[in-house]
């Protein structure tokens, strides 16, 4: 491809990406199909969380927390949902229940509404409370995917009579996937004695920052999405239901070397992301250990990063495959690489690239790309979760929903054994601990990691996504 054509493709990619950025992801809101895919005396409000990296006031942090008295996800909020928030805030739980039920009939794919409905049904009765920390302000689609898993587990346990007769309440926290904000939210949660456990956080950097607070306060946190190897053994109260990057890197390395088969790779990564660096480093180790080679590295974080020039350089240096270790913040740059590459080199990627936007923007250029993800809805036909989740949400769900469901189920089992902070931690580390999740049995290693293989998926033409391309499971290596 000539330099002129590469530049044209890149320009078109940028225009497409910008055009799609404001539209949201169709899967998450409109119709059944693949779904890839935050009582008080305070007045109800549509929470507009402050942004930025400077420390926020206690009041600003409280605006990021809600069990039903604040609207954290205003996107496509129905009028009945907004009135339910007002009713919940004033303690009129019956009105809140009625309005939330009406809202869910209009938008059954709304996890915030389902969580608030279950909380309203509890009202002021005794309950066990956990928090779900999600990146509403930074990645609303990922936030809702995670909340769907939490909401489904809460809904199931409460419909079955609760935890030894006591219902489960969920507090939603919006951390914007910002490490500093996450630390402040972690402090607020740790200082609230009613919070017995936390689901979160989203990105590895955010979880790493918050984990220090949780560990100091002996509050269990289970991340469904943070994969950096830095989290392994970081603290006896820190767990995750998602496999670490080591599992993903090993699977991608084996696929490249034995199935493509190719020996030389170029890696694109974000040096400002713990997750991205972790996946890059683990893949590099795996490839060299298996007899392959990394011929070049390209950093998305560099101010002069150019997708067309980088792909051209990778090919000139002998790369036979491209590995996209992008994080959420650099997904657009990764998709520029996909466009410019134009299927010249095979593509491999981590789980952050598993989004509807990849199919939407990557289009034909993403065909044949292989990704390592923790779970896929079509890969485990024996599980009940794919069917029950589709019935509840009127759409198929992503791995983020499944692993958030698993994290919530693990906390529920911990609460069943001993409904205290220390009791939950001891239960999760017990040799006989086991919970049944969407992705199979849930057990934790002493490091807090989950010992579970990843699933490889490939992009193929299809109609499940409405974009003309789908993620399809690959058989195990």
Language-model segment annotations:
Residues 2-477:
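Extracytosolic ligand-binding ectodomains
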């Amino acid at each position: 491809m000539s330099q002129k054509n590469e530049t044209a493709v890149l320009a078109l990619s940028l225009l497409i990406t910008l055009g799609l950025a404001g539209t949201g992801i169709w899967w998450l809101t409109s119709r059944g199909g693949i779904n890839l895919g935050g009582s008080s005396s305070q007045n109800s409000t549509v929470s507009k969380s402050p942004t930025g990296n400077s420390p926020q006031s206690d009041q600003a942090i409280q605006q990021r927390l809600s069990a039903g008295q604040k609207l954290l996800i205003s996107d496509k909020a129905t009028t009945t949902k907004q009135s339910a928030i007002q009713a919940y805030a004033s303690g009129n739980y019956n009105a809140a229940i009625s309005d939330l039920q009406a809202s869910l009939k209009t938008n059954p794919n709304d996890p915030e509404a389902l969580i608030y409905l279950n909380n309203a049904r509890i009202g002021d009765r005794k309950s066990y409370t956990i928090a779900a920390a999600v990146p509403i302000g930074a990645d609303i689609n990922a936030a809702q995917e995670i909340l769907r898993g939490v909401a489904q587990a809460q809904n199931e346990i409460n419909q079955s009579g609760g935890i030894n007769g006591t219902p489960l309440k969920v507090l939603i926290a919006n951390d914007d996937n910002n490490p500093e904000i996450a630390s402040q939210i972690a402090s607020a949660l740790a200082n609230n004695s009613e919070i017995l456990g936390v689901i979160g956080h989203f990105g590895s950097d955010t979880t790493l920052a918050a984990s220090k607070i949780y560990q100091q306060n002996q509050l269990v946190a289970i991340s469904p999405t943070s994969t950096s190897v830095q989290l392994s053994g970081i603290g006896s109260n820190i767990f995750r239901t998602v496999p670490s990057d080591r599992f993903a890197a090993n699977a991608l390395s084996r696929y490249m070397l034995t199935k493509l088969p190719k020996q030389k790779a170029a890696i694109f990564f974000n040096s400002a992301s713990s997750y991205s660096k972790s996946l890059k480093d683990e893949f590099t180790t795996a490839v060299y250990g298996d007899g392959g080679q990394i011929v070049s590295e390209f950093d998305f974080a560099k101010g002069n990063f150019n997708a067309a020039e980088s792909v051209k350089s990778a090919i000139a240096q002998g790369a036979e495959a491209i590995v996209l270790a992008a994080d959420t913040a650099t997904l657009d740059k990764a998709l520029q690489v996909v466009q410019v590459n134009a299927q010249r080199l095979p593509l491999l990627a981590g789980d952050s690239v598993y989004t509807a936007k990849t199919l939407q923007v990557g289009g034909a250029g993403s065909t044949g790309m292989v990704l390592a993800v923790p779970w896929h809805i079509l890969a485990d036909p024996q599980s009940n979760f794919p069917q029950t989740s589709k019935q509840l949400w009127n759409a198929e769900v992503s791995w983020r929903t499944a692993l958030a469901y698993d994290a919530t189920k693990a906390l529920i089992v911990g609460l069943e054994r001993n409904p205290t902070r220390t009791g939950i931690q001891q239960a999760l580390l017990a040799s006989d601990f086991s919970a049944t999740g969407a992705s199979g049995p849930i057990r934790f290693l002493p490091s807090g990691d989950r010992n579970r293989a990843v699933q490889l998926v490939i992009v193929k033409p299809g109609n499940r996504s409405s974009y003309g391309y789908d993620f399809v499971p690959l058989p195990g290596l």
